[in-house]
């Protein structure tokens, strides 16, 4: 946050008149000019920016080492992202392309109804964890698509798939203050976890509760061994 500065407001016609009436080297006054000072000081902003945890969501990271590496990499590419009021955050542009040259490993992922090895497999765990955090922070969801299968690392209805040239996850900061994304990959008790925290400024004590309901169960018709 940069310090604020006072400004002076005046009309060009007043300035032109004073300039034309002044002698060479003379200092003139603009009697109708007004001094405008900032409504909020830098010190006041420092006290309210990112001072509250709007939400936090944690998922357990499992699978092959390549998958865990991909989750850790995507987390590192979204952490620290700041959305000003009214701005949106798109997940895809921050983490793609899913290529070896961009640091990604081959790992299992969903593709056209099947689980296959692909470069960047597991990248959707970060988008899903971020989506859940955005939901619990009551932020506006602009784009979100679920996986074709339920994901074992997150609850029903809380996943968000992202694919290069395909589904995207995007949400908007619909609060009046900036929001910072903090993504942390850590190990505890020999297990890996991803925690996404959204920091901002709370203006009330409201909170979000999410409830899922099974509307229909479709029995399988093919048994895959």
Task: Name each model feature, range by range.
Residues 1-225:
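Well-ordered beta-sheet/strand-loop patches within structured domains
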């Amino acid at each position: 946050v940069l310090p604020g500065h006072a400004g002076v407001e005046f009309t060009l016609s007043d300035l032109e008149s004073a300039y034309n009436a002044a002698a060479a080297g003379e200092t003139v006054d603009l009697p109708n000019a007004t001094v405008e000072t900032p409504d909020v000081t830098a010190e006041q902003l420092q006290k309210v920016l990112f001072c509250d945890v709007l939400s936090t969501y944690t998922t357990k990271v499992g699978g092959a080492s390549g998958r865990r590496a991909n989750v850790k990499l995507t987390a590192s590419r979204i952490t620290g992202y700041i959305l000003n009021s009214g701005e949106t955050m798109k997940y895809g542009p921050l983490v793609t392309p899913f290529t070896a040259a961009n640091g990604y490993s081959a790992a299992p992922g969903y593709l056209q109804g099947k689980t296959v090895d692909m470069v960047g497999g597991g990248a959707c765990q970060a988008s899903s964890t971020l989506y859940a955090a955005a939901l619990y922070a009551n932020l506006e969801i602009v784009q979100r698509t679920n996986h074709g299968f339920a994901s074992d690392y997150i609850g029903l209805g809380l996943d968000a798939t992202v694919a290069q040239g395909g589904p995207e996850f995007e949400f908007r900061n619909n609060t009046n203050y900036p929001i910072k994304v903090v993504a942390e990959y850590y190990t505890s008790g020999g297990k890996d976890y991803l925690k996404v925290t959204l920091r901002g400024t709370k203006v009330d004590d409201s909170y979000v509760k999410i409830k899922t309901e099974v509307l229909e169960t479709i029995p399988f018709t093919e048994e895959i061994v």
